């Protein structure tokens, strides 16, 4: 087979270049949208106040509950914080019955969730649970309640640390009577109906949880400044000065602890530059967006997150297969693409293929060959085909990593975080940053190309994997919430 296939792959790959000048333009626009989001509501970057006003330092202690409703599974865990940056975690997971995901009544769903919490307590914390029932029977004074962090991964309007109204359901859920209601109150109502010793102390976003978990397990001099997820989706949360959040004066919210002068902001950066003033936009990006179920929104996420990179690659491969001889039998190969290959199906290519192909250093790209067979049922792809695939994978993955530097650089610059000699700690989670080879390296290359960061600023940024924001992170937010509540009671 001629190298025309490779030439074409190289040409397409160039369209995914994201040079230093573009990174710098992106950073300027991100800072503009970031400040706009801190000033007012209904902006491109939501910049949601979380009402979490401090981060842990690793000495926190206690037993907390966390529940996570983010998709088809419901997870209940208890986290015992040992006070020395370590913790132990016990958990159970249950699939949510399909009929509850789209039922007429939110009460059914939340009662189901509360029953799972009850079952978990009876199995794992039975002594505490029985003692609670005993005290309740005897009517003896002060109850010992478990504080619970509720990770609820749907769009919510947060109005307090444990108060947030559901904006809309996503991910296959559709229970209209919950929309516009406070999801913490719905869960608490179901818990109270079953008379459980549990208080919903905090509404948790998993990205904020990532930041908190990192701050507890890897405390530096200053605590963690930013948490970011680069996985199926992408988002970031960071610590902002209260006096840089003018919209706190105008939005409706419950009382909160102002003593630290700071608050974690949930950026919701997947929607950065929805109007495409600075983001790169290849033909494949345009097609993916037009055929998605939410055209015109989450434009940053559609170029960065795992859910979409596989689809961008699939479209580029399909284009080359249809027009430029990729995966076509030739002198050196008897390649076969069956009709039922997922190459021909939207969302048919899982992003894990990209990590495998990027990591393949074998002479004849055997791992890539195997991956094409496993993922796309393509048999006996030639080495030239595999090289073309690797060329495209490299370009798409590298662009995603370089784009990821944009919000990071922008937040570092806008908050003045690089003005001191302190290290800036960043906690990251997600399959891309964890498994895609050199994702952090490409991200740092782009960071250094931003003049206000440069090599000196890049050296101050410490990036570490932070696992389980919706478990240990949620528990830590419940802890901070109960401390804040106690402080405010005292102040009154």
Regions found by a protein language model. Give the residues of each.
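Glycine-rich phosphate-binding loop of actin/hexokinase-like ATP-binding domains
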Residues: 86-91, 171-180, 211-321, 327-331, ...
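Contiguous N-terminal and early-domain "leader" segments and peripheral loops that mark the onset or edge
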Residues: 8, 31-39, 52, 60, ...
């Amino acid at each position: 087979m001629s190298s025309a296939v490779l030439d074409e792959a190289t040409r397409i790959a160039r369209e995914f270049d994201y040079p230093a000048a573009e990174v710098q333009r992106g950073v300027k626009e991100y800072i503009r949208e970031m400040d706009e989001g801190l000033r007012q509501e209904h902006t491109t970057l939501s910049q949601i106040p979380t009402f979490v006003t401090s981060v842990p330092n690793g000495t926190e202690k206690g037993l907390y509950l966390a529940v996570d409703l983010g998709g088809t599974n419901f997870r209940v865990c208890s986290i015992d914080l040992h006070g020395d940056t370590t913790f132990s975690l016990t958990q159970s997971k249950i699939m949510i019955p399909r009929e509850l995901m789209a039922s007429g009544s939110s009460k059914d769903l939340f009662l189901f969730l509360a029953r799972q919490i009850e079952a978990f307590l009876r199995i794992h914390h039975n002594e505490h649970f029985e003692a609670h029932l005993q005290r309740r029977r005897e009517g003896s004074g002060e109850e010992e309640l478990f504080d619970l962090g509720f990770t609820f991964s749907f769009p919510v309007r947060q109005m307090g640390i444990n108060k947030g109204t559901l904006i809309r359901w996503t991910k296959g859920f559709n229970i209209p009577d919950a929309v516009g209601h406070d999801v913490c109150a719905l869960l608490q109502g179901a818990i109270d109906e079953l008379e459980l010793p549990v208080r919903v102390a905090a509404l948790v976003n998993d990205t904020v949880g990532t930041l908190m978990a990192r701050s507890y397990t890897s405390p530096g001099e200053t605590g963690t400044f930013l948490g970011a997820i680069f996985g199926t989706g992408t988002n970031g949360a960071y610590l902002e000065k209260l006096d840089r959040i003018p919209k706190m004066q105008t939005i409706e919210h419950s009382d909160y602890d102002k003593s630290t002068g700071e608050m974690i902001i949930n950026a919701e950066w997947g929607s950065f530059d929805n109007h495409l003033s600075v983001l790169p936009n290849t033909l494949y990006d345009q097609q993916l967006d037009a055929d998605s179920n939410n055209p015109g929104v989450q434009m940053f996420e559609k170029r960065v997150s795992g859910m979409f990179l596989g689809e961008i690659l699939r479209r580029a491969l399909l284009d080359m297969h249809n027009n430029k001889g990729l995966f076509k039998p030739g002198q050196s190969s008897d390649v076969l693409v069956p009709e039922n290959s997922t190459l021909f199906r939207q969302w048919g290519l899982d992003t894990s293929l990209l990590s495998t192909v990027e990591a393949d250093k074998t002479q004849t790209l055997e791992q890539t060959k195997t991956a094409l067979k496993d993922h796309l049922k393509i048999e006996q792809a030639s080495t030239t085909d595999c090289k073309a695939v690797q060329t495209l994978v490299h370009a798409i993955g590298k662009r995603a990593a370089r784009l990821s530097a944009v919000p990071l650089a922008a937040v570092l610059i806008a908050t003045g975080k690089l003005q001191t000699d302190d290290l800036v700690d960043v906690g990251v989670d997600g399959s891309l940053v964890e498994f895609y080879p050199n994702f952090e390296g490409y991200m740092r290359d782009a960071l250094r190309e931003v003049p206000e960061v440069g090599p000196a600023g890049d050296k101050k940024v410490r990036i570490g994997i932070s696992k389980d924001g919706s478990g240990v992170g949620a528990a830590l937010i419940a802890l901070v919430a109960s401390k804040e509540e106690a402080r405010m009671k005292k102040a009154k």
